[in-house]
Amino acid sequence: MSVKIRLARFGAKKRPFYRVVVADSRVSRDGKFIESLGFYNPMLPKEHELFVKVKVDRLKYWLSVGAQATDRVAWFIKKGIINIETV
């Protein structure tokens, strides 16, 4: 089973809201997931405290046991939007 950390889309039409989830790679984007790690709201400005909110300790755990972050989640980590050095 290949596990990925990815975004699952929620919200209404033209008002996207994403959850950062851990899911099996074979499951559909908005399908069943193992654990919800946080959320991402692209409708808010980047400076807003609720733009991205993630349980950093759980994110570090899943990365340590071999879960792969998708391109977008890896971009958040690389740019420092999700700061994994805080814990």
From Swiss-Prot:
Ribosomal protein keyword on record: yes
Single biological process term from Gene Ontology: translation
Pfam families hit by this protein: Ribosomal_S16
Keywords: Ribonucleoprotein, Ribosomal protein
Molecular function in Gene Ontology: structural constituent of ribosome
Example of a GO cellular component annotation carried by this entry: cytoplasm
Entry-linked SUPFAM superfamilies: Ribosomal protein S16
Family (UniProt): Belongs to the bacterial ribosomal protein bS16 family.
Name listed for the protein in its UniProt record: Small ribosomal subunit protein bS16
